[in-house]
């Protein structure tokens, strides 16, 4: 086997193999131990040191000197100021091996550029040398957290806590986005929903003022009074009096008299809503109270877009939540019909809850949806809690 050998490349010891020594045309100038000037040609050069043949000047291993390395490039000479220490001296050949000391990054970059270009066979140019000296050739050292080169106990706890918090926030944000996308593309939502209870309305028999005898959500038996009203006698007789009876004296007497009456309950009911405040004037026929029978069962009435008609078959499972209840409930569709008979508008859906719904929720809005994966209730609660905070 024929192996090509480059005689210009000499390797140092195994421990120093990272520094390739090359024979560059360069010289070293320094002041000797006796203050005499020494100028010698380099035998070889590496990024870690150099070697030269010493003259008759005394030199010993361990001596420390300051000098200049002189290079000739494109008929231009330039020098590098270096500090070096004598590491070995061969008495027979007077070969002196030296090691660089306290080299700055610029000097190291220049030496590496010269050696690399020489080994690659490239022409060394002044412009390339200037570019090498101007750019940043070394990475900065990493910052140490402490004097011992590592973090302490509290530093580790803080780092783990911060990492865990960032991880939890990231998982929560991902779950929130996933839940929103699922609700948007895979869940059908009603445009509106309300808790509906069979009710009866109490209207004003005469023009006048109303005074309630019961509080909100109060229960009342059939025939029991629920409110009193007072009407002006003149307003009641208006249109029934002749011109002779409408003299100023009679008008003054009638104007000062009030007729009082009582509004009674038509069933064993509960007061769902009072539509006219106490002492407020009401017209004849105006609804005063909305009553719901005690044994009535509340249901949900919702409106869906007509494009979702295929999903609104009777028996379809739905999910809903009543405002102010905070509980996710389920039910099924029992009846569907177009709103006001108009096929181009919305579809009215009546929903029967799986669990009895308190009639006190009558009139409250409800959020109704069709579809959903198992466990969405827990996910919705978690998302609601996170957004509330």
Swiss-Prot record:
The subcellular location is:
Periplasm
Catalytic activity reads:
[(1->4)-beta-D-mannuronosyl](n) + GDP-alpha-D-mannuronate = [(1->4)-beta-D-mannuronosyl](n+1) + GDP + H(+)
Pfam annotation, one family: HlyD_3
**Which ranges form a coiled coil?**
none
User: Boundaries of each PilZ domain copy?
Assistant: 16-116
Any single GO molecular-function term of the entry would be: bile acid transmembrane transporter activity
* Gene Ontology CC terms, in alphabetical order: Gram-negative-bacterium-type cell wall; periplasmic space; plasma membrane
Signal peptide boundaries: none
Q: What is its main location?
A: periplasm
- Specify the enzyme's EC class, one word: transferase
Q: Which UniProt keywords apply?
A: Alginate biosynthesis, Glycosyltransferase, Periplasm, Transferase
Pathway assignment: Glycan biosynthesis; alginate biosynthesis
Q: Which Gene3D superfamilies match?
A: 2.40.50.100, predicted glycosyltransferase like domains
Q: What is its EC number?
A: 2.4.1.33
Which BP terms in the Gene Ontology apply to this protein? alginic acid biosynthetic process; bile acid and bile salt transport; single-species biofilm formation; xenobiotic detoxification by transmembrane export across the plasma membrane
Role played? Required for alginate biosynthesis.
PANTHER family, per the entry: MEMBRANE FUSION SUBUNIT OF EMRAB-TOLC MULTIDRUG EFFLUX PUMP (PTHR30386), MULTIDRUG EXPORT PROTEIN EMRA-RELATED (PTHR30386:SF19)
* Family assignment from sequence similarity: Belongs to the Alg44 family.
Protein name (Swiss-Prot/TrEMBL): Mannuronan synthase
Origin species: Pseudomonas aeruginosa (strain ATCC 15692 / DSM 22644 / CIP 104116 / JCM 14847 / LMG 12228 / 1C / PRS 101 / PAO1)
Whichever gene encodes this chain, its name is alg44
